[in-house]
A protein has these predicted regions:
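Bacterial Sec-dependent N-terminal signal peptides
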Residues: 1-30
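Short beta-strand-initiation
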Residues: 8, 12, 139-142, 287
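Short acidic (Asp/Glu) and glycine-rich catalytic loops that position anionic groups and cofactors
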Residues: 21, 185, 321-323
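Flexible, low-complexity junctional segments that flank or bridge functional domains
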Residues: 23-220, 227-233, 248, 274, ...
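Conserved acidic, small-residue-rich alpha-beta core segments centered on
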Residues: 200-334
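Extracytoplasmic/peripheral linker and loop segments enriched in polar/acidic and small residues
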Residues: 324-351
Length: 352
């Protein structure tokens, strides 16, 4: 990704609210207040002008629009008897967007959409951990080992578990992992329940897997208060890393694979041929979030920039894997992970 361009844009976004406050806003509007109608109006307006997925979530031609919801919720706000009740009502309103990046942060709670609704059962963390034993190592937030569990020692399959992108994964970490798995003829990267974090982690891991320097996606940023106010698509380019892994690979995903982890799936699926994805459709989260403060001091986070894959398709709704596979009762009874076992079988078949 062009980090210089992205950082410059972020600096501009940070400075713009300060300029607007200094030049246009009435100081009275900045006063702290717990008034429910005032805070509801602020929340609704912030999302109305800044949220980037109304066309997908609540289109103007749909049965219910964002303006319709304002009319529906205004009398309900007037009936709120407590701060907790008002908080829950605002979260209910936001959940109409079905976006895990739209969250409300109060001193007493955090609310938002549950990205796992309607998901397949794809992960038993306790069983997954068995496949890392007894030779597990850790490089940053990557847990890895050659698989020996369940009589797979001779198969020579490497296994990486990345439960989160919240901590930085450096090229030093990746070099350590791939050097120690260099003898493996195939690799499984487990991204199940990785809820995202630092987009730079997706960039670095993808740069190891892509075959060459390439465009892995596109981004479009909100440029005005209208629902259609967007700038042109900007390319997301990645350079192939000094470390490279081009052997057969299976990446495991589920509905918990979200945000930056979802971006990794988009980057790699659209640009590689040696990588298969297995599990369930990813959770999505194809919008870069930003935050705004409400008059009562609560913080509202929401998606403000839209991301697309290399084929210019939106990744907000999630990405379908090549192979649908869920954890089975039979596999659980045998203390086996059905996805890992199937991935091993595919990798062995592909190496024959």
């Amino acid at each position: 990704m062009n980090l210089t361009r992205l950082q410059s844009g972020l600096v501009g976004l940070l400075l713009l609210p300060l300029l607007l406050i200094a030049c246009t806003q009435d100081p009275k509007e900045q006063r702290y207040t717990k008034d429910y109608q005032t805070n509801f109006s602020a929340l609704w307006t912030i999302l109305d002008e800044g949220y980037c997925f109304f066309d997908d979530k609540l289109p103007a031609s749909g049965d219910t629009t964002w303006s319709d919801l304002k009319a529906i919720y205004t009398p309900r706000v007037a009936q709120c008897q407590s701060e907790d009740e008002f908080f829950d009502l605002m979260v209910e309103l936001m959940c109409h967007l079905k976006d895990g990046h739209v969250n409300l942060f109060a001193p007493f709670d955090v609310g938002g959409w549950d990205i796992r609704k309607g998901s397949r059962h794809c992960l038993d963390s306790r069983i997954r951990n068995l496949y890392l034993q007894p030779h597990m190592r850790r490089a940053g937030s990557i847990y890895y080992a050659p698989i020996t569990y369940n009589d797979h020692t001779s198969d020579s399959i490497g296994y990486m578990v990345i439960p989160s992108f919240s901590s930085s994964i450096s090229l030093v970490h990746l070099h350590a992992v791939f050097t120690r798995l260099a003898h493996c003829r195939g690799l499984i990267i487990d991204m199940r329940s990785n809820g995202g974090g630092l987009l730079s982690n997706a960039d670095r891991l993808a740069s190891v897997l892509i075959p060459s320097d390439t465009i892995v996606g596109y981004m479009s940023t909100k440029t005005g208060p209208g629902h259609q106010d967007f700038g042109p698509l900007k390319e997301i380019q990645l350079a192939r890393a000094p470390i490279s892994w081009q052997r057969p690979t299976v990446i495991l995903v589920d509905r918990g694979t979200y945000s930056a982890a979802n971006s990794l799936v988009a980057y790699v699926k659209g640009t590689t041929r040696h990588v298969l994805f297995m599990g369930d459709r990813t959770g999505g989260g194809g919008g870069l979030p930003r935050s705004s403060e409400l008059p009562n001091g609560w913080w509202l986070r929401y998606s403000s920039s839209r991301m697309y894959d290399a084929q210019r398709q939106s990744i907000e709704g999630g990405i379908e894997p090549h192979i649908i596979q869920e954890q089975t009762e039979e596999a659980t009874a045998k203390q086996q992970d059905a996805l890992i076992e199937r991935a091993i079988a595919l990798l062995l078949k592909g190496n024959k």
